[in-house]
Amino acid sequence: MSFDLILFGGTGDLVWRKLMPALFQAFRHGSLPEGGRIVGVARDDLSDDAYRALIKSRFDHVELAKRPTDEEFARFADMLFYLRMDLSNPLDYPRLESKLQEHVADTVVMYLATAPSLFTTFCEQLANAGMSRPNMRIVLEKPLGHSLESNRAINSAVRKVFDEKQIFRIDHYLGKPSVQNLFALRFGNALFEPLWRREDIANIQITIAEDIGIEKRGAFYDGTGALRDMVQNHALQLLCAVAMEPPINAHADAIRDEKLKVLRSLKPWTPETLRQHVVRGQYGAGSVDGAAVAGYRAEAGVNPSSTTETFVALRCEIANWRWAGVPFYIRTGKRLAGRSAYIEVNFRPAPHAIYKSPLGAGNRLVIYLQPKDGLELHLFAQGQQNRMTSNTLAPVQLDLDFDKRFGSERVGAYERLLLDVIDGRLNLFVRSDEQEEAWRWVEPIMQSWAADPEGPRLYAAGTWGPSASSAMIARDGFCWSEVC
């Protein structure tokens, strides 16, 4: 199957840090279909060869399992081409059409690695130029809008040109191997699903922590914040994966129907729960890995009096028979004490204790997403001392490291998702109604913050966020995993 993959924003950060390395890995693994072209599109004045040289130079600064040899990159570079184009200029679209006519492809993928403000413009100009066709697919990066209203406007503009089956709204967390293994763990094994219910689970925690700051994205981040950047998409998609009912089959819409039910079952916010169950923070100066780092307001491109949040922690509940009364805790932030992303399922203690164990202790299942990729099951076993007579239990853990088990060059998130787009598989992509429900649920939080004169709570860089985050979960008698 021949394909054209058109990367708009072809000289941008996302393309050289994530997309090109993923495409190279797919090429190295022999997964890219033969007869394909990868066309970078940007406003820079570059030749094909100059673009290839630019990508090669950038490969020295990205994560790859193994550096490409000159011969290996040369073979990959044979697929790379470049087109100078301004998406906002209607006069440039005939040049795009000419580029597509150079290569008759079975599938044409339009990947918009650009600012969301250009999504509507691109679709309108594509339609005006008469260039939309059934073999086209469009990939949209998050954040898809700034609010429920803007999200609907973008989706409306895109659907005027593309059918829903042609639209791939990407959330790279869904491409992570551990997330896919969460589906396999739940729906491919009979062990856990009978316990996956309110009677056996005390709480579920979702953590997406970064130790880096905003790097060079000050202007973008200051207009976005952690709620829009991480919670509305990544965190809520992870919540859906862990809480959804078994789908009737493995087809895309069957999976997305069940995720939609979870989003629609989230308890709506009230003034009281907004005060008690939502914490926003902003990092101040501190120390990360022994090095002093500046506070958020001192970062380049950030308003010195900014109230943009770099940390969010919240408590939510799902109002259905499986999960009623079980608290779900979500937290995400920049400049935290470590880089990690995981889902922790905390089971209830044994109902009748005949052994001595830590007070209130229950089993835990931890699904690690990054940097580790694996599962840990925390159990209790009889202690080593006085084994013949002791009735004291000690914690033990079963550890499955997917990288060690299946090899360190497994398919990464973007590699998997890019191949899915080329092949037309929608299972790991987000449908428009899912996005709208997610925006509908987070919008009251944004509105309450806009009316709050106090702004975010300050936390020192290199810590786990504001103390109010720990106080929030402690009110339920629980604690975050790093302190339990």
Where is each model-derived feature located?
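Secretory/organelle targeting and membrane-embedding segments
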Residues: 1-139, 144-484
